């Protein structure tokens, strides 16, 4: 995997050159994905906003994610992450959206998944999703690994569209 600084610069270069925008919904990373995107000079030309709907109760207000929206989707599934990404993209009116849902730990087995489990969805000109398992139960370490994985997936998808 590329170094995170290189990935962030690559994302910024592509988005700026194509005049495209991105928004983020993240739960277990607590803003780390958004912070990474904002850390690059020029971020105001591509970063529209991010939300951290950590409590389920705010997802409806912030993203129009309701029980009916996700009825039939398994928690922590790639389909669930894609639903969040698509709603984020639509709600924030961006070209791209990144959604991350995860269990950072150290407590376990939420929805039957162990700490270190995460799903990422990318919605945009091309969509992609991934299930990530770190095998770790250290909260801060998982948060950073989830962030890096989400940004790497986004950079890969952007590159595929670029070529």
PLM regions with names:
Residues 1-163:
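Short alpha-helical segments enriched in small residues
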């Amino acid at each position: 995997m590329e170094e995170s600084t290189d990935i962030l610069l690559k994302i910024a270069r592509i988005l700026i050159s194509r005049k495209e925008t991105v928004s983020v919904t993240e739960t277990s990373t607590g803003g780390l994905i958004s912070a990474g995107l904002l850390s690059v000079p020029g971020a105001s030309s591509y970063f529209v906003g991010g939300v951290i709907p950590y409590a389920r109760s705010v997802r409806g207000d912030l993203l129009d994610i309701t029980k009916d929206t996700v009825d039939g989707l398994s928690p922590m599934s790639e389909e669930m992450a894609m639903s969040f990404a698509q709603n984020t993209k639509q709600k924030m009116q961006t070209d791209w959206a990144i959604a991350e849902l995860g269990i950072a730990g150290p407590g376990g087995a939420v929805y039957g998944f162990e700490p270190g489990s995460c799903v990422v969805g990318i919605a945009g000109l091309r969509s992609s999703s991934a299930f990530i398992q770190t095998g770790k139960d250290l909260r801060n370490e998982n948060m950073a690994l989830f962030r890096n994985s989400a940004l790497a997936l986004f950079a890969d998808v952007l590159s595929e569209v670029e070529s």
